[in-house]
């Protein structure tokens, strides 16, 4: 798990492409101080597993699904990327829950300055926008940001100078593609509210939920279920 607080930016040294996958090598510093094989590092918000490393670089495999769903396939030698190590159990929770599993990509449609802040407008698909709420959280290229506005097929975030200067946002321009990960809590809530998505029944069908009487109920979380359980 990550928190969306970028530790440093790294530089892509090379990307070796196969038929349907790739090996990404990134030059870095801070995220390598205690790295071990098999550790997770988020690269532009995508959780990757370290397969090789040295004092100043690491490599990770990028699978077909990841290349299709994220912007990593567009990286090239010299590209700058956001980096974050997986959160330690006793670490500071500075952002929000970020899994590193990208929901899709968006396109930067507008950038404007507002005093010392910079507003970024991101156009996204309906499958991503459905989970976005004003003042809620979203990860853009692995950066935990607060949604400032929703408008039609887009949403906007307001970025402070420190965040822009210490991430890849400062180099973004109109038309650029960014990785997007919705707040996972919203996705779980929607899943639990679906009929048949009860407490039991991991496959999502034939599921039942226990009522206050101890008897099983089908249909997931419903109004009658909430009333029966004191809500």
State what each model feature region is.
Residues 1-231:
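Conserved loop->alpha-helix
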